[in-house]
Amino acid sequence: MYALLVFVERYSECKPVSESSSSTSLSAMGLPHGNKTSDVNSAAGSVPTTLAIASTSTILTTSQNVSGSTRLSLTQSQDFPTSTPVNCKKATESDTTPVVFVRRGPMDRNRGAGKDERNDLSVIKERVLNAVSDQSLSGYRSVTNKTGNSPKSMPNDLVTLTDVPDEYRTHLLWEYYKVDGDKVPRAEIAAMPLLSQESMLLDELLHCLTGIRESLLVPQKPIISAVGLAKYDTDFDIHTHLDRSLTHQVREILPLASYFMGVQKIIAATDGLGQVMNSLNEALQELTHDFYLIIVQAEQELRHNRLTLQKLLYYLQPTMWVMHEVWSSLVIIQLSDSRDAEVLTYLHERIKRLEGNKDAQQLIIGLVRKAAKPYMRMLQMWIQKGVIVDRHREFLVVDNEVIHRDELPEHYSDDYWERRYTLRDEQIPSFLAKYSDKILRTGKYLNVIRQCGKRVMPTQEMNLEFDPTSERHVSVINDAYYFAARMLLDVLLTENDLMGHLQSVKRYLLLNQGDFTMQFMDACEDELTKNVDHVLPMTLENLLGLTLRISSARNDPYKDDLHCELLPYDLVTQMSKIMKKEENWQAQPRLDLSGLECFAFTYEVKWPCSLVLNHISISKYQMLFRQLFYCKHVERQLCKIWKENSIARQFEPQAASLYRAAFTLRQRMMNAIQNLEYYMMIEIIEPNWHIFIEKMKTVENVDNVLRLHQDFLDSCLKNCMLTESSHLNRSIFKLCKICLKYCEFIQITQRYFQDAELRSMVRDSADSSESEQESLHCPQIETPLDPTDTFSERVRRFDLEFTQLLISFLKQINSMAKKNTADCFMNLVHRINFNAFYTDQMDKMCVEDAIG
């Protein structure tokens, strides 16, 4: 329709053609001449293009009624731009000579129209609008004779559009386009015989089924406030003078016209809204074409007088059922504003609900298969090459292009794995939901392989298509996943020696290299006992390098990846921040800590091994290292005072008895610290490491490697009491602190032991009674630690404080063991309290807690 309006606005009309010429033109297009206009309209109902052709021919035919003064001529070379093919006749000496209109180029479309031609534009519009109306050819002649040839006698606004916005209207959307004008009264339908009524009704019904407005079947104006399915439903007013039997039958067929027009509206409204919708609309266009073929076949039957309403209803009944299913599905999609993957999900679920309706189910299966083609093409590119081609953001994987591996902070190189590619949940079709994680990992693997400088070459070509009746796409996804997983695993384990790096990390950060640990502590003890602000990192690095080259670690190929680090927080703070996944650690105020409390080893690892040994994993290793290293330092200090206190053997028996309490306390401290170290290193770390290594021998993909490695670290942290929920690490830290204070106290009082020894040697030559009296009082010399306390009193206080802390620690372990018997905490209790020395005191504390 719009093509015809553009045609008449830009160009003048052709010369008049005789009736025989017009008839010949219609015959040349395959339409029977000599029939009434409804036959032409019937042929036009088959496809909208045919309607445009027939209307143009009618324009040329009716031009013979115009007076000679208004006739216009065109040169033979004149051509016309149209959106649909246009055929007409050119007036020449011979009326039967056909005229062929050639499409003009864009630059020539505004040329060739004279001033006189533009003056008669209103006359041409009048003829076009009347030609496509429901008037017959003779009726149009009556109108022109009655109104005359003056363009001023015609109204300016003859056309009333439907409620569909112009931007939704396409050459396929007719939607009962209404043309108002002077109507030629038809014969009274009530006065016609029943067969004539049925024949006329059939003719108009076939037009109505394709969206052409007729007089007996008038579509009602859409209700603006309609909601739900009614928004895309069309009701019709049937002529009241029709026979009731015909009215009843036509009412059963008219819903098909409503379904068809609703489908056309949705096609027009969703055009260009993504690849999935475009592909679905293409499939619906094929369905529309098949529907037009059915109407054409019905028209052929009508021309041969072999069609009745009852037969038409019988023929169209299966089509109505199927079209209703298509219409209702599309309306629900449109009302819910579903797009892309949501459309595929709805149609896929709709298939399951149509188990009893095979025809409708097969049709929806065909629609889903075609609508999913662009989505499956994107999926194939992702799992085959790791590439995303998604202009409309329809795919389930999104590429966060802002995050690049080379631009990431040093501590977050593993974020390339975690953040570069992520799932878009709203774009996952239901039939891919179970495999979405596998799809994501497949493309990730391929991209990591490409980042390692290797070329991604699939072993075989794949053709990924979605078929709701089979699971072939699942096998294609699985094959692509296993190929990428095996290839990346080979890159990590073989080409980059991931296991060698893991062994090196365990050797240094979990104190598995015993001789290196002791030599390093001997070399760095003086430096680490300073305040952290006075410790020189360069000195530590030099001592580390020296120790690595004189110990058995000199043969380690990755020893140069080990470095020293001074952290601005203690172990408790680090543990809290790791468990809470905080990142801005440097924002906290600096604490007054010693170098020993802030020291940790760090391990420098390069891509792609940083996927496994990422910053969080190294931080967890550091937590284990710091607790083990601190306990090892406490053990060394206790051993040192044991050596220095050997001088007490030279004391007199009465004087030496005063030191027995100090020696006993030191031994109890040594027993607790050594058993704590043995528990963490031998009973926790080694068994878990052995399990981890055994599982790594059968691993199939990198995600399993990540999972196994994290399970190993988490299990070690939990059983080594380094989780925020247990608070046991605070008790361990307090125990170590009291042990170090005790060692410091013993070392400070060491000179008094030496004085006592010298005095005892001098007094051997003096009076024996005086010597005994002074030797008895010698250990009771006041110390600078506390002028009011004697040595034995200080030892007694240390004993009481240590015992209370240790019993509280054991009590906490007992409490946790009751809640979770699978933990290994009770082994530590049995080791420390091996002779039930602390049992009575623990029971006493439990009773006191229960009472008050």
Swiss-Prot record:
The keyword Membrane does not apply. Its main location: cytoplasm. GO terms for biological process: astral microtubule organization; centrosome cycle; cytoplasmic microtubule organization; meiotic cell cycle; microtubule nucleation; mitotic cell cycle; mitotic spindle-templated microtubule nucleation; regulation of cell cycle. GO terms for molecular function: gamma-tubulin binding. Keywords: Cytoplasm, Cytoskeleton, Microtubule, Phosphoprotein. The modification Phosphoserine is found at S73. Disulfide bonds: none annotated. InterPro entries: GCP, GCP_C, GCP_C_sf, GCP_N. One of its GO terms (cellular component) is spindle pole. It is found in: Cytoplasm, Cytoskeleton, Microtubule organizing center, Centrosome; Cytoplasm, Cytoskeleton, Microtubule organizing center; Cytoplasm, Perinuclear region. Belongs to the TUBGCP family. Gamma-tubulin small complex (Gamma TuSC) is a heterotetrameric complex which contains two molecules of gamma-tubulin, and one molecule each of Dgrip84 and Dgrip91. The gamma-tubulin in this complex binds preferentially to GDP over GTP. This is Gamma-tubulin complex component 2 homolog.
